[in-house]
């Protein structure tokens, strides 16, 4: 049946004239072939879980937040070591450095690096000098520590070990000068004395506190002798 509107804009056609559409879509059967190994893994997993051994299948994931840099793991603070080096090389109070941090906040890696550096420039083909310098550093610091405790000083062995190690820096500074002017005996001797006084003053000003009072020379003198011995290991005297 067909209707024609008066305005002629639309034409309506009955649905009986349209063809009916029908059909089916064949979907192939899809099977996942995981292989025999997958079946064995599934069976093993089920077997372990049924027997109460499921915890063997758990994988622990390491948290990245717990990982720390290597320097932090070894307790190495490069900024702190650099500041202590400046305190030792410039011991004058007028420069404004908080020099007591070398004594009150001792560390091991900084002094060890200084001692090893002094040992390396002292080798001159004699590798046994390295072990001698490290031995003198350890036992010389122990002697200064015991003497300081006997005199009533409130210092620890770690503090003495750090101060004595860092105070080797003046001897490292004068080492290149001795290589250049080694032929001038008078000038070379003056530089050696200056280096020893520099190192001894830097160490003594950190270790010898007000608690020693009139006993200061009793501790300053062995410190001075210790750095003379260090210098003798370098020069081969």
Swiss-Prot record:
InterPro entries registered for this protein in UniProt: Yip1/4-like, Yip1_dom
One Pfam family this sequence matches: Yip1
Bridged cysteine pairs (disulfide): none
Recorded topology in the membrane: Multi-pass membrane protein
Subcellular location: Golgi apparatus, cis-Golgi network membrane
Keywords (A to Z) from UniProt: Golgi apparatus, Membrane, Transmembrane, Transmembrane helix
GO cellular component: membrane; trans-Golgi network
Gene Ontology biological-process annotations: endoplasmic reticulum to Golgi vesicle-mediated transport; vesicle fusion with Golgi apparatus
Transmembrane region(s): 107-127, 132-152, 161-181, 189-209, 217-237
Record topology, Cytoplasmic segments: 1-106, 153-160, 210-216
Superkingdom field: Eukaryota
Stretches in topological domain Lumenal: 128-131, 182-188
Family: Belongs to the YIP1 family.
Purpose: Involved in the maintenance of the Golgi structure.
Xref: PANTHER family: GOLGI MEMBRANE PROTEIN YIP1, PROTEIN YIPF4
Annotated protein name in UniProt: Protein YIPF4
Organism: Danio rerio (Zebrafish)
